[in-house]
Amino acid sequence: MNIGDVIVFTSPGAVATVCGDTVPDLVKRVVALPGDTIASIGNRIYVNDQLLKEEWTHNEPLGRPIPTTVVPKGDYYVLGDNHPNSCDSRYWGFVPRSAIIGKVFVRYWPLSRIGWL
């Protein structure tokens, strides 16, 4: 996995409790890899002391604050591209490698944005 990859993974058990969603699989973008340092300051997210690209940050505090944390070996930190409405690692934490089904390689919706990722 690489930063920016869009992945499909088995929904963590906390999703139903925290987000009220019972879908079996989720699709999110990888923003931090094992060994990366992640933190939130105000309403911005930093990975290895670098502010994430604007489209990956949120405009108001969502989820839980992230103290400076190193992503554990074998885990990934993911965010949804529709960040203001996404239940993602900000709410339920890291995604273990064992839960990842694969990488998304094509977008087919909306039709105006169809193409390879």
Where are these regions (language model features)?
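Soluble "head" domains of membrane/secretory-pathway proteins
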Residues: 1-117
